[in-house]
Curated annotation (Swiss-Prot):
A Pfam family per the record: Aminotran_3
Classification via SUPFAM superfamilies: PLP-dependent transferases
Key word Transferase present: yes
Entry binding sites for N(2)-acetyl-L-ornithine: 135, 274
Name of the protein: Acetylornithine aminotransferase
Gene of this entry: argD
Superkingdom per UniProt: Archaea
Length: 390
């Protein structure tokens, strides 16, 4: 089948929930992907910050193939070696003691909300405006963007939103029924919004003073994206609960709720569960992925390459009237422009660079952490060209 036929079949048989780019991808390697016509692209989107170790990493591919020949699924009625090995590894690299396995970031956030309510006996969850936590009914309600939740009313009760970065507003919002505060360390879908210095530490202190749990949604920031294994380490905070997914499995769908011992023990058999969560196949992929992150020092590389990427963007786009801001942490970068950025995405793709437009006016750049300097240079040249033409 050619691209035109595949696109037509998608329109005919698949529910139209996505606005897709008009290319059909075939394969990838490192930070490069190819479409079925043979065109190559520098991937600065990484499947929404998923392919952090690059496409088709041989160690992860081997782990997936090997595990598929042994045991793909068993359910959580039985023990498996791969699941406990991954749980032990996650507690070793995070500030947490116990793990619940899920299949996605939304599932992880659902689990975190349930755990917080069970542990505290309270119902209210405070989230930030402009946030994104998932598309299930609870997580889309926690999400601080009405465009995602309005079509699905009535929504679950017990959620409140305050401006991101405003500690005074957060303090005013905390009350007797507040179970938890859930925040992204850096808002991704909201436009790559970095919190003011000290904000997350102030929220942590506020939560502790009021016996409120702090949940950090590290679905997008986790596993090296910001220049540290977890963004909480970068900002010097220790949340009660952390949610992860995206980059965790190297492309295989897997997520997790990480929690401190005293909080985690609130869950009892039957309180929560998942048929596929923590299956041996996904756990094998995640173990291999995390080992690659550590062995190749990819968090440190993200810090170095992110600094280089930001510097090159600021150099090339200096004085460009269309650019309002260039910001980022590690390899999580946003270019805010004066106007809609969908046209920039199209123009960059036609010149061989894949990027994303979020929050309407922010070009989001989240490439694989293995991206090379020469690939960054090529991507910056393209972005400089298409943005300067605005």
């Amino acid at each position: 089948m050619d691209s035109e036929e595949i696109i037509e079949l998608e329109r005919k048989f698949i529910m139209q929930t996505y606005t897709r780019q008009p290319i059909v991808l075939s394969h990838g390697k490192g930070a490069t992907v190819w479409d079925i016509e043979g065109n190559s692209y520098i991937d600065c989107f990484a499947g929404v910050a998923v392919n952090s170790i690059g496409h088709a990493h041989p160690k992860v591919a081997l782990a997936i193939c090997h595990q598929a020949q042994r045991l793909i699924h068993s359910s959580n009625i039985y023990y498996t070696r791969e699941q406990v090995e991954l749980a032990k590894l996650l507690t070793a690299i995070s500030p947490h003691d116990r793990v619940f396995f899920a299949n996605s970031g939304a599932e992880a956030n659902e689990g975190a909300i349930k755990l917080a309510r069970k542990f505290t006996g309270k119902s209210e969850i405070i989230a930030a405006e402009n946030s994104f936590h998932g598309r299930t009914l609870a997580t889309v309600t926690a999400t601080g963007q009405k465009k995602y939740s309005e079509p699905f009313r009535p929504l679950p009760e017990g959620f409140k939103h305050v401006p991101y970065g405003d500690i005074g507003a957060m303090a005013d919002a905390v009350g007797d029924e507040t179970a938890a505060i859930i925040l992204e360390p850096v808002q991704g879908e909201g436009g790559v919004i970095i919190p003011p210095e000290g904000y997350l530490k102030d929220v942590q202190e506020l939560a502790r003073q009021n016996d409120v749990l702090l949940i950090l949604d590290e679905v997008q920031t986790g596993f090296g994206r910001t220049g540290a294994m977890f963004a909480s380490q970068l900002f010097g905070v220790e949340p009660d609960i952390t949610t992860v997914a995206k980059a965790m499995g190297g492309g295989y769908p897997i997520g997790a709720v990480l929690a401190n011992e005293r909080v985690a023990m609130a869950f009892e058999p039957g309180d929560h569960g998942s048929t596929f969560g923590g299956n041996p196949w996904g756990c094998a992929a995640a173990i291999a992925t995390i080992e690659v992150l550590m062995d190749e020092k990819l968090p440190e590389r993200a810090a170095k390459m992110g600094s280089y990427f930001l510097g090159r963007l600021r150099q090339v786009l200096h004085g460009c009237d269309a650019v309002r801001d260039i910001r980022g942490v590690g390899l999580m970068i946003g270019i805010e422009i004066d106007g809609e950025c969908a046209g920039v995405v199209d123009a960059a793709r036609e010149m061989g660079v894949l990027i994303n437009c979020t929050a309407g006016k922010v070009i989001r750049i989240v490439p694989p952490l293995v991206i090379k300097k020469e690939e960054i240079d090529a991507a910056v040249d393209v972005l400089g060209h298409v943005i300067s033409d605005l």
